[in-house]
Amino acid sequence: MNFKYIVAVSFLIASTYARSVKNDEQSLSQRDVLEEESLREIRGIGGALLSAGKSALKGLAKGLAEHFANGKRTAEEHEVMKRLEAVMRDLDSLDYPEEASEMETRSFNQEEIANLFTKKEKRILGPVLDLVGRALRGLLKKIG
């Protein structure tokens, strides 16, 4: 009788343990699914912000390019125009990453483009980037 009781209790403990392991696995898989969904949402928001930022930068670069395209240009303005065209190509490459290798063959990279900006351009871009940053912070506060 004691042997049957020990076997029954052992079986009960084993089945309870198996059920708890199964429940743990299910809760982990549900947690993984929820984490994956939240990561997708975060990536979606990040992608939307990135595309908005790219659009704003493209618009700014196009506006500056049009400004320098009208009328006579000095040598300095011509150099600025060439740099803006390079920046536009880099912004376009963000939309089409498969063309990034082609960009490298033309010897354009982020560090070189960053070094091309003169102090005058930094004075122009600084306040613009500050305004964009403030706008993004305002949007994030409204969203959050």
UniProtKB/Swiss-Prot annotation:
Chain positions found as Asparagine amide: 70
Entries under InterPro entries matching the protein: Bombinin (IPR007962)
Top-rank taxon: Eukaryota
GO biological process: defense response to bacterium; defense response to fungus; killing of cells of another organism
Propeptide feature ranges: 19-43, 74-123
One Pfam entry name: Bombinin
Other comment: BLP-7 is also encoded by another gene from the same species (AC A0A219CM62).
Annotated family: Belongs to the bombinin family.
Name of the featured protein: Bombinins BLP-7/GH-2
Organism of this sequence: Bombina orientalis (Oriental fire-bellied toad)
